[in-house]
Amino acid sequence: MPFSFIHYIISFSKKDNFLKKDAFHAGMRRKRLLGAGAAACLIPALVLGGCGTGRAQGEDERFRQYTREVFCQEISSDLVSLHYTLKEPEKYGISGAPAVFGEFTVDSAQIKAACENMETALTAFSYDDLNIQNRITYDILEYYLEAAEESADYLLYDEPLGLVSGVQTQLPVILSEYQFYDRGDVEDYLKLMQSTPDYIDSLIQFERQKSEAGLFMADYAADTVIEQCSAFLEMGDGNYLYSTFSDRIAGLDELTEEEKSDYIEDNALMMEDCVYPAYQTLLAAVEELKATGQNEKGLCYLPEGKAYYEMVVRQSTGTEQTVRELEDLARRQIVEDLEAMESIVGITRGEAQETAASMGKSDAELILSELREGISAAFPEYPDTALEVKYVPEAMEEHLSPAFYMIPAIDNTQENVIYINQAQMGDDLTLFTTLAHEGFPGHLYQTVFYEGTDPDPVRNLFSFGGYVEGWATYAEMCSYYLTPLSKEQATLLQKNASIILALYALADMGIHYEGWSRMDAVAFFSNYGITDADTVERIYELIIGSPGNYLKYYIGYVQFLELKKEWVREEKEEFSQKKFHEAVLTVGPAPFDIVEEYMWEITADSGADE
């Protein structure tokens, strides 16, 4: 599949206030394997797959040698992937990478060939002789190769200019968070900025091919992309890529003041000569291609669109359940949540919302501190880490998410950043649960805990949105019970949030699989008391522009609930939330079938020899 920088995006709505809530993991890694850099996989696959290294090394050692080679080949294919994955690449024997963002490809034959080579390489290892951690990695590699082969038939169906997760909104964030550890990083960054026009040209060429195939985006989606590009350009000299560069370079003691001043001038030159012109070119291209799209409705109206959506659902949720089975799962969870709400007497949801709106919790740092302490009873310990809270620039508040977490390099998890969009926080409860989603026990906690288990680095190449976003949503739901609200108030509001999330997931499947029209969506939401036409219109268009986006965090969330129910049935009176959480977190991001298979033995075996 074509790729740019790597991200996870989710969208979330709070009852009457439609919000786009991203868990933007700007890790610039995961989901890289077998993308445009697929050729890089051929070398380790061919060399190590058939080489006679000998069983004397031990199967685990041979396998880890192989996965290390795959990891190093992949992350060194472009500078962004390398820098966002490793702070000290030299410790992995990597001297550098091309100063590019990546590229877009429609070469399905190349991807399939790389898959076949890696599948052949895997057969050279004795699965039964691998320890549990390596068996998990093997299973994930096998799963991912099958998924990549399947995706290769639908390359032009992908949309890199997504309304929530598009290149046009995320590239500036990637640049603004590019860390400067030394002078070389500054030089590399400037080269990267210089490469922006080539990267955007590659993107435009991809969009032209989509247009020729009748797969270009709907007109209203193109209008949104145009607005987002325009907003970035209109920032002019006030663009945060000027100020963030100055802030980062100020901390480099090895540079003289004169050198810092020169670099600041170089950055301004790159903005004027490369970045802004690239955005102007992109804006013009989208304006030109607008109206060439042939479908303004769900994916099922495209040729093979229904089959493509089924694939999207499998890969975004990490489940093998059919769309119809997931629809039933969502409806059953709605009934369960409604029954929990109906069992509460003496308080209304409206009263609970009024209390929650003024909890007196408005300081992000204090909330995060409280969350750290509050989760200690039910969640396992995690490595010490630092956290910086930053705020979305005012000029971009309309176009960026309420909050997002930046994934740190895997060898630098001590440094973490969460961005807050103050314009979209709404009330105290929104801020509290959002910080739980992004921080503790959500994305930040899950990332730091997992990296603390010393996993195989190759697993950082893969994206399992159902697990990652599902966990963060599960964490968000848990956080309602850590607020100052009474248990009854928390239950009402948490179950209500869960139901709303379910409705958006059902709408996603209804629009893209069942073929709902706009009026069908209006009728569906009106049945649940959501009658504001503008809100439903925005929901419909966002779902059109981001197929499967809601599913990865709602279905992922429900999958964690299902795993917990299974754990309770097995453990009975011995059930421990902390042990359950430790088990699923130690398995780490993976399809849910793999999580379920290994969660029972992983904690006991996590110290096995590698």
Model-predicted segments: where are they?
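N-terminal secretory signal peptides that target proteins for export/translocation
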Residues: M1-R29
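Intrinsically disordered, low-complexity repeat and linker tracts
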Residues: L19, F24-R29, L42, T53-A56, ...
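Sec-dependent N-terminal signal peptides
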Residues: K31-I43
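C-terminal motif of bacterial Sec signal peptides marking the signal peptidase cleavage site
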Residues: V47-G50
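N-terminal maturation segment of proteins
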Residues: G52-E610
